[in-house]
């Protein structure tokens, strides 16, 4: 956050944040409302939600949704972390892919026909057409997402300028703490769910407000969310589904339904299920996203009806600082998408899917807490934060 402000000299910071389920295809550790508080306490001025129909997708769709929201909010610059750290290299890579598009697409098909996943085939295709050091490594996850952000800016004819910050010390998929002060989200999650894990062990790697809110959520609700807590419900869902039922679920294709129904029979945990399910053809993340859609009963027809090829259909405002509120007031008439401060009255397929995902997310809570949280999520107004007093209003 500090590097972003320094690099962009921004007046305000806007964060587009996933809701209950993440792009990796797993439940968020804590609710979006607690994560909104974390963002506001650490310098963000506006927090808006990336709808489920974008948030649980491949990088290209994820980026398109995020950029369409930021474009509607009339931001001038975006800033993303990357393994490369040089924005010029992203522009070079985009230019080369555009010039070599026919060759690139043929290579992707060739590598997929050899049994590789789409992600691996794409990475290998890039390695064939990119020969200069002034290009990015498209096997790295943050480079991939940054590349898609920039492609989305171009495809949407946006005036947004892009900046990138190099990630140091910790890589996206690192499962252990490799540095005294910097850790990946993956390693922090793994530590929290390990037998020896505690909030004390992650304190050196997180802002104090973030650690406090994590501990507060665990104290108030008794849990931190991960896939294992949903496994019983997930397995029940699959045990009551036929291959035909499963084929209707979004991202279930190429006969994957038969493999899923076969492997669930003898799986006693989500991890053991995933270990049995994974193949060269499908990445772990891709399979987790498919599992998320099974869990939330998100069908191919749901996604088609949401019409996500264009742009986000609305902006759900989750939180704002005093500066953020002033910015919205000044620019509200220029913002073309509807801004939702609650979801009681707005009607859209994407929002129906969002509500369903929230219901599933809170399903592991005990009653009456579960019903209370679901009701609050619909009626919850944006969290307000006074950055001068550092108090929530």
Swiss-Prot record:
<dbReference type="InterPro" id="IPR014729">
    <property type="entry name" value="Rossmann-like_a/b/a_fold"/>
</dbReference>
<feature type="binding site">
    <location>
        <position position="81"/>
    </location>
    <ligand>
        <name>ATP</name>
    </ligand>
</feature>
<dbReference type="GO" id="GO:0005737">
    <property type="term" value="C:cytoplasm"/>
</dbReference>
<keyword id="KW-0694">RNA-binding</keyword>
<keyword id="KW-0963">Cytoplasm</keyword>
<feature type="binding site">
    <location>
        <position position="142"/>
    </location>
    <ligand>
        <name>ATP</name>
    </ligand>
</feature>
<keyword id="KW-0547">Nucleotide-binding</keyword>
<dbReference type="GO" id="GO:0006400">
    <property type="term" value="P:tRNA modification"/>
</dbReference>
<feature type="binding site">
    <location>
        <position position="167"/>
    </location>
    <ligand>
        <name>ATP</name>
    </ligand>
</feature>
<comment type="function">
    <text>Catalyzes the formation of N(4)-acetylcytidine (ac(4)C) at the wobble position of elongator tRNA(Met), using acetate and ATP as substrates. First activates an acetate ion to form acetyladenylate (Ac-AMP) and then transfers the acetyl group to tRNA to form ac(4)C34.</text>
</comment>
<keyword id="KW-0819">tRNA processing</keyword>
<keyword id="KW-0067">ATP-binding</keyword>
<dbReference type="GO" id="GO:0016879">
    <property type="term" value="F:ligase activity, forming carbon-nitrogen bonds"/>
</dbReference>
<dbReference type="GO" id="GO:0000049">
    <property type="term" value="F:tRNA binding"/>
</dbReference>
<comment type="similarity">
    <text>Belongs to the TmcAL family.</text>
</comment>
<protein>
    <recommendedName>
        <fullName>tRNA(Met) cytidine acetate ligase</fullName>
        <ecNumber>6.3.4.-</ecNumber>
    </recommendedName>
</protein>
<keyword id="KW-0820">tRNA-binding</keyword>
<dbReference type="GO" id="GO:0005524">
    <property type="term" value="F:ATP binding"/>
</dbReference>
<dbReference type="InterPro" id="IPR008513">
    <property type="entry name" value="tRNA(Met)_cyd_acetate_ligase"/>
</dbReference>
<dbReference type="Pfam" id="PF05636">
    <property type="entry name" value="HIGH_NTase1"/>
</dbReference>
<keyword id="KW-0436">Ligase</keyword>
């Amino acid at each position: 956050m500090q590097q972003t402000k320094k690099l962009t000299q921004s007046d305000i910071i806007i964060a587009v944040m996933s809701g209950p389920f993440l792009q990796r295809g797993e439940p968020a550790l804590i609710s979006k409302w607690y994560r909104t508080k974390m963002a506001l306490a650490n310098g963000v001025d506006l927090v808006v939600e990336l709808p489920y129909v974008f948030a649980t997708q491949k990088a290209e769709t994820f980026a398109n949704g995020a950029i369409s929201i930021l474009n509607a909010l009339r931001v001038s610059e975006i800033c993303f972390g990357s393994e490369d750290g040089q924005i010029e290299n992203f522009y070079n890579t985009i230019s080369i892919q555009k010039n070599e598009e026919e060759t690139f697409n043929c290579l992707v098909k060739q590598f997929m026909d050899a049994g590789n996943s789409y992600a691996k085939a794409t990475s290998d295709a890039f390695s064939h057409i990119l020969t200069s050091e002034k290009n990015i490594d498209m096997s790295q996850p943050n480079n991939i997402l940054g590349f898609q952000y920039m492609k989305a800016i171009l495809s949407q004819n946006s005036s947004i300028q892009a900046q990138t910050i190099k990630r140091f010390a910790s890589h996206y998929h690192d499962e252990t703490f490799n540095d005294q002060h910097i850790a990946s989200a993956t390693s922090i999650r793994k530590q929290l769910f390990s037998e020896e894990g505690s909030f004390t062990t992650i304190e050196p790697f997180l802002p104090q407000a973030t650690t406090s809110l994590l501990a507060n959520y665990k104290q108030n609700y008794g849990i931190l969310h991960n896939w294992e807590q949903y496994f019983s419900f997930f397995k029940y869902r699959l045990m009551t589904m036929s291959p035909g039922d499963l084929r209707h679920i979004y991202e279930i294709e190429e006969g994957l339904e038969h493999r899923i129904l076969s492997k669930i029979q003898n799986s006693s945990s989500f991890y053991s299920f995933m270990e049995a399910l994974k193949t060269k053809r499908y990445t772990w993340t891709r399979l987790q996203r498919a599992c998320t859609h099974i869990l939330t009963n998100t069908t191919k027809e749901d996604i088609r009806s949401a019409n996500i090829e264009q742009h986000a259909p609305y902006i759900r405002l989750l939180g704002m600082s005093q500066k953020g509120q002033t910015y919205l007031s000044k620019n509200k008439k220029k913002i073309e998408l509807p801004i939702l401060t609650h979801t009681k009255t707005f009607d859209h397929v994407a929002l129906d899917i969002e509500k369903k995902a929230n219901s599933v997310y809170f399903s592991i809570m005990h009653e009456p807490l579960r019903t209370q949280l679901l009701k609050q999520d619909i009626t919850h107004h944006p969290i307000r934060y006074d950055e001068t007093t550092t108090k929530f209003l």
